[in-house]
Amino acid sequence: MEKSPEHCAEGSPSPATESAPSATEPPLPSTEPPLPSTEPPLPSTEPPLPPLPPDFEKYWKSVQAYPEDFNTWTYLLQYVEQENHLFAARKAFDAFLAHYPYCYGYWKKYADLEKKNNNILEADEVYRRGIQAITLSVDLWMHYLNFLKETLDPADPETSLTLRGTFEHAVVSAGLDFRSDKLWEMYINWETEQGNLSGVTSIYSRLLGIPTQFYSLHFQRFKEHIQGHLPREFLTSEKFIELRKELASMTLHGGTNDDIPSGLEEIKDPAKRTTEVENMRHRIIEVHQEIFNLNEHEVSKIWNFEEEIKRPYFHVKPLEKAQLNNWKEYLEFELENGSNERIVILFERCVIACACYEEFWIKYAKYMENHSVEGVRHVYNRACHVHLAKKPMVHLLWAAFEEQQGNLEEARRILKNIETAIEGLAMVRLRRVNLERRHGNVKEAEHLLEEAMNKTKTSSESSFYAIKLARHLFKVQANVVKARKVLSNAIQKDKENTKLYLNLLEMEYNCDIKQNEENILAAFDKAIKSPMSIAMRVKFSQRKVEFLEDFGSDVNKLLDTYNEHQKLLKHQDIVKRKAENGLEQPEAKRLHAEEVSTAASVPVTTASMDATQSGYNYGSWYQYNYPANWNFGQYYNTPST
């Protein structure tokens, strides 16, 4: 169960022990151009803003600089509470709760500050915002109900209607939570205080069919409620008449012909009246016993899952692996066995406790795709705008969903937002490129790739985007000249990047070989004369010999290339012998180091993106299977030296 109002800040240090440099908050830019004024402006009637507490700015600057550091927020909030400065408190709490809306205890703190300053309407608004942000918080609903009890006028006839409506809203919103027992009990106790015993019966009838932690206790108290009052008191008139008719029909079926009133009339015979009361009580308990038995069976199915949930509330600290696994297994169980209502409630509970984990939000959105388009958007919106603002995969999936729905502008906006939040994210830039390509905007796709290529900070990143751009120009726009230029320029900047040469060759091979022989040979020569390792240049040389053997038009070129290849092989042997004698680093070891360096420099993003990179493994596009060294001596005589 949600612990205490401070549960989001366990172990938070006092602001007195921390400090941060001071600064002022920059003004927000205007989004509308000012209209021309034809009259002199009227003097402002709004009172000037009160000065902020002396140390407010240093704490404010700290949270602006590190919005994801929970402790910096707690320093700020503790400070404004100590100062009891309402304007500063509003600014701090509004900003904090925009980042951490699931910290239900801070909604109460905020409302208490408003109430302390006699701002009852403002406090009510804070509570309403809170329960809208975390609808399943049983504790927050109960705090709000207690607030209403304290602040509403008991003499006003509307008060009881307001409270009853709020209780109903609370149990509809949070009453299916397994740990919602105390909210139901609060509702029952309040209706009992109002003397509305039929209302109490109605609440119990609903509660006994809901799997909750103290389901058995509720049934026991329900039986006490039935045994402690007369049916006329705890049943509505309609229910009383309906039950009386049911019992009368059962009596007539049994052969008894006693006169039993069909309406609300009292039975005059005391003995018969007592018998009817007992029969009614017995029948009501009997009906609810069946409901209880079914509910007990449902509770038994989920009891072990519920017992394993140790932290049902939100916290910034990571959950233990066992807790995460329990949520996964519980969700799978409900997806196979539960109703839509129960599944949605469990997902909502899960994304409170596991708010910082992408996989649960994604699973929730995927489930909602079969039920409600707006429901999917609501899930993605909460995940991407509040809890997972810098997690790319959930943004990518949201953008893909909107693209499926035909909302291209929304998909563009989502991708642009995450790219702004995390600069240099290759997977997002490529998703933006391919979104435009899929919908025929090939020039915009080209522009996005060029922009990414020119903004990179390293030559390897620039080469990565150059390869992408060249493939786009060649395969999508059929512009081989422009694609060749892109790769050639990239080679000039990153002369040891094997992938550039391989992609240039691949492109030239895919053109008409007869008409493109000179360009293919030029591409081979670029690689062979490059500063790449001798082993890699030998491989390109082997490929050149093979090309001329299979497709070449001039035997003289073939013989010349073969001779050059033999010289390169001899040079490779010399390098190898030097390495064996300890004069140079072994070629194989150096090659391995270069491969590791190249792999490490591929532009991805942050350390947290490891799990998402497997889907963007471009290495397979650049692989070639080179044969072993060919013995061309069987065809050509080795030239004399």
UniProtKB/Swiss-Prot annotation:
UniProt gene name: prpf39
GO molecular function, one term: pre-mRNA 5'-splice site binding
Gene3D superfamilies to which the protein is assigned, alphabetical: Tetratricopeptide repeat domain
Localisation per UniProt entry: Nucleus
Purpose: Involved in pre-mRNA splicing.
Species name: Xenopus laevis (African clawed frog)
Protein name, entry field: Pre-mRNA-processing factor 39
Main localization of the protein described in the UniProt heading: nucleus
GO CC, alphabetical: commitment complex; U1 snRNP; U2-type prespliceosome
